[in-house]
Amino acid sequence: MERKFLTDLGLNPDQVNSIMAQYGKDMQKYEGLEAERDALKKTSSELSNKIEDLKANSANIEDLTKQIEKLKLDNENATKQLSAQKLDFAVTSTIKDFGAKNAKAVKALLNHDDIRFDSKGNLTGLEEQLKSLKDSDSYLFAEDKPAGKPIQAFLRGTGSWRQGCQPASEDCTKIERINK
C-alpha cells in the first residue's frame, strides 16, 4: 500500500500514518510467515530426499545383510568340509598304519559316528574299532612278521663271511646292503 493512494482517498496525514503503521505490522507478520513457510518447504524437501536415500540404503542394507548371512553359511560349510577332510585323512592314515591291505574296504566297515577328535586333537574311537576288526577279519590286514635274521653272505672264493673284506671294497658294500 502506498501513502499517495491513501491521501488521494481524502485521508488526513495522521490517518495515513496510523494506517501505514498498522500495515507495516501486518506486513512484518506476513513476511515472517512467508519466511517460515519457505523454511518449512525447504525442510520438507530435505526430509523427502533423506527418506528416499534411506529407502535406497535400506534396500542396500537388506542386500548386504543377506550377503553376510550367505557368507557366514558358506564359511560354516567350508569349515565343516575341512574338518571332515581332516578327519578322513587321519582315519585313512591310521588305517594304513595298522597295516590294512585295502583302506577303502576297512573304512567301509567302520562306524564313523564314533570316530572323533578329542580336545587334544587325537582320534578317539578308531583304534578300538581297528583292533576289533583286525581280530575278526584279519584277512584285511597284512600279517605282522617278526624281523628276520640278516642274510649271511660269503665272499667269492673265501669260504667265510667278510673274511678278507676291505671296508671300501665293492664286495663289502654289497654284503652290507644285503644285510640291511
From Swiss-Prot:
Q: Which InterPro entries match?
A: SCAF (IPR009636)
Q: Indicate whether Heme appears among the record's keywords.
A: no
Instruction: Supply the Pfam families for this chain.
Output: Phage_scaffold (PF06810)
* Keywords noted in UniProt: Viral capsid assembly, Viral release from host cell
Is Transmembrane among the key words of this record?
no
Q: Which GO terms describe its biological process?
A: viral capsid assembly
Name the family the entry cites. Answer: Belongs to the SPP1-like scaffolding protein family.
- Which proteins does it associate with, and in what oligomeric form? Homodimer.
Say what the protein does.
Answer: Scaffolding protein involved in the icosahedric procapsid assembly. Coassembles with the capsid proteins to form the procapsid, in which the scaffolding protein is found within the external shell of icosahedrally arranged capsid protein subunits. In a subsequent step the scaffolding protein molecules are released from the procapsid.
Stated name of the protein: Capsid assembly scaffolding protein
Q: What is the lineage of its organism?
A: Viruses
